Amino acid sequence: MNEDTFNISIRKFPKMVGVSSQREIEHAVEKARSSGAIRGNEKFPASVTLDVPGLKLSVKFEGKIELE
């Protein structure tokens, strides 16, 4: 195993997930606000599941998205 390759890879993956998921959430909130589906002061439960089948890893992370 190449430690440098591994370390770079495990840093890149969460960064990509973070940036992409933030963009998706921002678009969903803007669409919901524009259509009047939400007021803009809500709190939404949110979860993300990390699956790495080759390592038999499945971890769920839970939190909330607060608009105000």
Language-model regions, residue ranges each:
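Long, contiguous binding/interaction regions
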Residues: 12-20
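N-terminal intrinsically disordered, cationic/polar leader segments
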Residues: 2-11, 27-30, 37-68
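Compact soluble domain cores
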Residues: 20-27
